[in-house]
Amino acid sequence: MHAVQLAAVNELTIASVPDPQAVSGEVVVRLRAAALNHRDVWIKLGQYAGLKFPCIPGSDGAGIVESVGAGVDSTWLGREVIINPSLDWGGRESAQSEGFSILGLPREGTLAEKIAVPAANLAPKPAHLAWEEAAALPLAGLTSHRLLFARARLRPDDRVLITGIGGGVALFALQLIVAQGAEAFVTSSSAEKISRAVALGAAGGADYKEAGWATTLAKAHGPFDVIVDSAGGEGFNDLIDLTAPGGRIVLFGATRGNPSSVALRKIFWRQLSLLGSTMGSPCDFAGMLEFVSRHRLKPVVSEVFPLARAAEAFALMERGGQFGKIVVTP
């Protein structure tokens, strides 16, 4: 089969590799579509823990079950499925196990024509989604659903701020918030992305590159009951100032690194909660799929590339030009 293969840091090729085989408890899925995440770019750039080359990246995928291994229900054969990229979560809902990993490293990922995965990580493809939309759903849907519902305990009367709108998780979080009946606001350095977020249901937004943006946003729309952030860095104290007393800040990344200082007194005096969130459990995945099907939500797909042009898909994500998920089709 053909697959995207990272032979070393910044060495991406389309390679011919052996077809995967389903061992006991596994299935082989012929992929109809896959999608990129920032994680794939960080692996390509050598900026991810536990690097192993060569590897096939990709955490998101949807396709048709082609074969099953020993012990797997044969009724999976021929079924349209999406893949839960959260592997070996473990028995606790509160946090993942030590054996937890994400599909696409160290296990071979979805940027290929076929993939072998545990049967326990399959779910029926939501019937209202096209293949490209279904492939765009797993990681962003799982991550955003857990951080909003399991961690932040989102309520319909909440006012929520999402920082850095445009990526898959942030955009799907916006869709979940709007569907739940809560009020969403966004930040971006792009007026176009803010405008497109408003078209999806956001109540407003702010350009975080503008001087005093946090003060202006607070006066116009704040404070916020929930703030969703994946950046961290030196602007983190602005988020503390924007949070309502008793509010929750949920972090699912730290792309700008650690802040040099944190306003701890404001956190304890105003009864704020700082919450971390990573991926999600099988229960979170099932809950996300139920919510998506009930509200007929569709992930935003920014652009679709054939597998042969995967390098262009990676380049688009590296420069941050996407609004929504970047999809690759074999």
Region locations from a protein language model:
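NAD(P)H dinucleotide-binding glycine-rich loop of Rossmann-like/cofactor-binding domains
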Residues: 85-164
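Adenosine-nucleotide cofactor-binding segment
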Residues: 162-165, 178-235
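Hydrophobic/small residue at the entry helix of a nucleotide-binding pocket
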Residues: 143, 168-169, 234
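Residue-level marker of beta-strand positions
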Residues: 79-80, 114, 159, 179, ...
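Short, well-ordered loop/turn sites that connect or cap secondary structure elements
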Residues: 75-76, 154, 243
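C-terminal capping/lid region of NAD(P)-dependent oxidoreductase domains
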Residues: 2-4, 221, 296-300, 311-330
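Glycine-rich beta-strand-centered segment in the early N-terminal region that forms part
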Residues: 18-34, 47-90, 106-109, 126-128
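Glycine-rich phosphate-binding loop and adjacent beta-alpha segment
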Residues: 99, 180, 188, 231-300, ...
